[in-house]
From Swiss-Prot:
The record marks N5 as: Discriminates between blocked and unblocked aminoacyl-tRNA. It is found in: Cytoplasm. Belongs to the PTH family. CDD domains: PTH. It catalyses: an N-acyl-L-alpha-aminoacyl-tRNA + H2O = an N-acyl-L-amino acid + a tRNA + H(+). GO terms for molecular function: peptidyl-tRNA hydrolase activity; tRNA binding. The keyword Membrane does not apply. This is Peptidyl-tRNA hydrolase.
Amino acid sequence: MGLGNPGRRYALTRHNAGHMVLDELFRRHGGRWRRARRAEAAEVSVEGREAVLLKPATFMNESGEALSGYRAEDLIVVHDDLDLPAGTVRVKVGGGAGGHNGLRSVISRVGNGFVRVRVGIGRPPEGADVTGYVLGRMDRAAREAIPRAADAVEAVLEEGPEAAMNRFNARA
């Protein structure tokens, strides 16, 4: 599942990092987008492993509504993260929402036992509005992380979460 807001207005914003990563995975693995329950979905095959790319058609704060019938242990949730420097990609299993309303909605639906691929967008400048920042256009460093975040999703699917964490969470 890639977190983001629907519509062109939000397509290139920091908060839509999750949607951008799913678009990259779709570009790599093909498939066809179809309308599913409260989401757009595409079935793809990654190294012989079937996966469903799911982009909620709801706004961020209601992202969990698209998860009817899914279990936490079957999910990889890709999302923007203010607490990581722009361009950083990290893999994590479990944890809280950390102030992210999309994650809060997902956790309220399925619990917190899912894998996360976190795309760093950095913090806004001192005194700047956080909402305006996350809904602002993604900068170059964060955009360049999108293919690496797609690599991280593929690594989770192919090698498992532990191996993906070892690979993507290593300090450079």
